[in-house]
From Swiss-Prot:
GO MF annotation, one: aspartic-type endopeptidase activity
InterPro entries in the cross-refs: Aspartic_peptidase_A1, Aspartic_peptidase_AS, Aspartic_peptidase_N, Cathepsin_D-like, PEPTIDASE_A1, Peptidase_aspartic_dom_sf
Propeptide: 19-53
Subcellular location: Lysosome
Glycan-carrying positions: 123
Domain Peptidase A1: 68-384
Organism taxonomic ancestry: Eukaryota, Metazoa, Ecdysozoa, Arthropoda, Hexapoda
Disulfide bonds listed in the record: 99-106, 263-267, 306-343
Entry EC number(s): 3.4.23.-
Gene3D superfamilies in alphabetical order: Acid Proteases
A Pfam family the protein falls into: Asp
Protein name: Lysosomal aspartic protease
Keywords per UniProt: Aspartyl protease, Disulfide bond, Glycoprotein, Hydrolase, Lysosome, Protease, Signal, Zymogen
Stated family: Belongs to the peptidase A1 family.
C-alpha cells in the first residue's frame, strides 16, 4: 500500500510538471552594447514608473539591456516572432506588415500580416505608447497567439506601425509581451497571461523565470507558465506581498554593502525582467558604485577593473527578513568594446519622486541569481536561489 502511494505521488508530480507551459529563452547581445546610453535608459524608467496619470507601460528604451527573448506565434497558420517577456508592462505588440517601407526598424524585423491569418479579427482601436525617442503607435487586432505549445484564442494585441529610434533597429527581438497587472494595460486590453489562465491553459495564475547565467550554454533560460520548476532552484521561496497591483512591486527591507546600509527603514522595489540592470536612488547608487571602486566614465556609467571582480564586496538585498547576496561576478557586466573586454557596474541611479517613488528596480542582474516566481493568484513575488 505504501509503495502504491509513493508511485501515485510520483505520477502526480510528473503530471504537475507536464501541465506547465514552457518557453525557452535565448540570450543575445544587448542593444545597449551598440548604443550605450544610460541617460536614455533613466529617462525611460522615469516614464515607466512616474507617469502623471497613473502607471503607463513603456515598451522599449529600457530594453536597451534586454538580453533574453523567447518565441511566440500569432495567427493561423502561425507567424513567428521573438519577444521580450516583460513584467514591467502588460500589452503584447509586434511590428505590422502595414508599417511604412521607410521605417527601417520595422523592415528589419518579423511583421504580422493579418491578411494571411484565417483567425484574424479586426479591432482597429488606436494604440500608442510615449517614450523618450518618440511614440510607438499602431492599432489593435485580435488573433490566436501560440507559445510553449498552447494556443491563446481571441487575444487582442497591437500591430505597431511606427517604431521610432535606433533602438528598434538594433534590437534582436521583434516585440514585447507584457506580464504586468491588467491595471497598466494600454486601451484596457486583457493581457496574454490572464487569457492563458481564463482559457484553462494553465492550472494556476503563476509564472516564473529562470535565467541561465552560463554564457556558454545553448539556452538562455526559461519562462514557465503555471508554476515553478523545482529543478531550477534550491531551498524554499521567500515570498513578498505585492503592495501595488500594477507592476510587481513589494517592500524591501534594506540594501547592505559591508557596514553601510541603504534603503533604511525599508523602501519599495519592483522585479522587472525588462532590464538587466539594478536601479535605485541616485545618491545611494552613487555610493554603491564608489564602494565597489567604480570609475565614472560617461552617461552615468561606472567602469570597474575586471581583475578586481573576485575581491569586490558582497552586496545584500534584504527581502522578507532574508539576505539575498550578490557577489562581484553577479553585479558586474562584461562588455566587449573595440576588441577588448571592459567591465561595467550593473547599478544605475534613478530618482523617482513620490508618490510612485523612490523605487529600486531589480532586473536580470538580480533575477539571474535568484529564480523568481510571480504569483498573481496570491499577489506575491517569490525568490529562491537558482541552480
Amino acid at each position: 500500500m505504501l509503495i502504491k502511494s509513493i508511485i501515485a505521488l510520483v505520477c502526480l508530480a510528473v503530471l504537475a510538471q507536464a501541465d506547465f507551459v514552457r518557453v525557452q529563452l535565448h540570450k543575445t547581445e544587448s542593444a545597449r552594447q551598440h548604443f550605450r546610453n544610460v541617460d536614455t535608459e533613466i529617462k525611460q524608467l522615469r516614464l515607466k514608473y512616474n507617469a502623471v496619470s497613473g502607471p503607463v507601460p513603456e515598451p522599449l528604451s529600457n530594453y536597451l539591456d534586454a538580453q533574453y527573448y523567447g518565441a511566440i506565434t500569432i495567427g493561423t497558420p502561425p507567424q513567428s516572432f521573438k519577444v521580450v517577456f516583460d513584467t514591467g508592462s502588460s500589452n503584447l505588440w509586434v511590428p505590422s506588415k502595414e508599417c511604412s517601407f521607410t521605417n527601417i526598424a520595422c523592415l528589419m524585423h518579423n511583421k504580422y500580416n493579418a491578411k494571411k491569418s484565417s483567425t484574424f479579427e479586426k479591432n482597429g482601436t488606436a494604440f500608442h505608447i510615449q517614450y523618450g525617442s518618440g511614440s510607438l503607435s499602431g492599432y489593435l487586432s485580435t488573433d490566436t497567439v501560440g507559445l510553449g505549445g498552447v494556443s491563446v484564442t481571441k487575444q487582442t494585441f497591437a500591430e505597431a506601425i511606427n517604431e521610432p529610434g535606433l533602438v528598434f533597429v538594433a534590437a534582436k527581438f521583434d516585440g514585447i509581451l507584457g506580464l504586468g497587472y491588467s491595471s497598466i494595460s494600454v486601451d484596457g486590453v486583457v493581457p496574454v497571461f490572464y487569457n492563458m489562465f481564463n482559457q484553462g491553459l494553465i492550472d494556476a495564475p503563476v509564472f516564473s523565470f529562470y535565467l541561465n547565467r552560463d554564457p556558454s550554454a545553448a539556452e538562455g533560460g526559461e519562462i514557465i507558465f503555471g508554476g515553478s520548476d523545482s529543478n531550477k532552484y534550491t531551498g524554499d521561496f521567500t515570498y513578498l506581498s505585492v503592495d501595488r497591483k500594477a507592476y510587481w512591486q513589494f517592500k524591501m527591507d534594506s540594501v547592505k554593502v559591508g557596514d553601510t546600509e541603504f534603503c533604511n527603514n525599508g523602501c519599495e522595489a519592483i522585479a522587472d525582467t525588462g532590464t538587466s540592470l539594478i536601479a535605485g536612488p541616485v545618491s545611494e547608487v552613487t555610493a554603491i558604485n564608489k564602494a565597489i571602486g567604480g570609475t565614472p566614465i560617461m552617461n552615468g556609467e561606472y567602469m570597474v577593473d575586471c581583475s578586481l571582480i573576485p575581491k569586490l564586496p558582497k552586496i545584500s538585498f534584504v527581502l522578507g527578513g532574508k539576505s539575498f547576496d550578490l557577489e562581484g561576478a553577479d553585479y558586474v557586466l562584461r562588455v566587449a568594446q573595440m576588441g577588448k573586454t571592459i567591465c561595467l557596474s550593473g547599478f544605475m541611479g534613478i530618482d523617482i519622486p513620490p508618490p510612485n517613488g523612490p523605487l529600486w528596480i531589480l532586473g536580470d542582474v538580480f533575477i539571474g541569481k535568484y529564480y523568481t516566481e510571480f504569483d498573481m493568484g496570491n499577489d506575491r513575488v517569490g525568490f529562491a536561489t537558482a541552480v
